[in-house]
Design a protein with these regions (language model features):
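Short, well-ordered beta-strand segments in beta-rich or mixed alpha/beta enzyme
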Residues: 5-12, 43-75
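An amphipathic, aromatic/His-enriched active-site/gating alpha helix that lines ligand/cofactor pockets
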Residues: 31-39, 60-98, 104
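Residues within well-ordered alpha-helical secondary structure of globular protein domains
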Residues: 24-27, 73
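A short acidic, often aromatic-flanked loop/helix-cap motif at beta-alpha or helix-coil junctions
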Residues: 50, 101-106
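Short structured motifs
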Residues: 26, 40-43
């Protein structure tokens, strides 16, 4: 049975960039929800505690294969839109930590 893959992206978002950033995240997640293998997502905003990252997004994919397929579709879509995520993050002054995770038994 394939193991779920979790895409977890953590961001330090300046207050001045918050609305534009969250609007972009919502649009991206709406597109991700249409992709085969999408299981669930969360967009989380820190409200207390000493953590560095104030916005965290997660997407659970059914398998490594569905994650890779969705990544290819998203990359192609960005190319069509002439959208460069790294340039947007730099322009908005956002620090990002992007990674894929698998679940461990507790």
């Amino acid at each position: 049975m394939p193991q779920s893959i979790y895409r977890v992206d953590k961001f330090v978002v300046p207050i001045a960039a918050r609305e534009e950033f969250l609007d972009r995240v919502r649009r991206i997640h709406a597109f991700l929800k249409e992709q085969p293998g999408f299981l669930q997502d969360f967009v989380l905003e820190q409200f207390s505690g000493p953590g560095e990252f104030n916005v965290v997004t997660t997407v659970e994919w059914a398998s490594q294969e569905t994650f890779e397929n969705a990544s290819a579709v998203v990359t192609a879509r960005y190319r069509e839109m002439n959208f460069n995520p790294q340039e947007t993050l730099a322009r908005l002054g956002i620090k990002a930590d992007l990674a894929n995770y698998k679940r461990l038994e507790a």
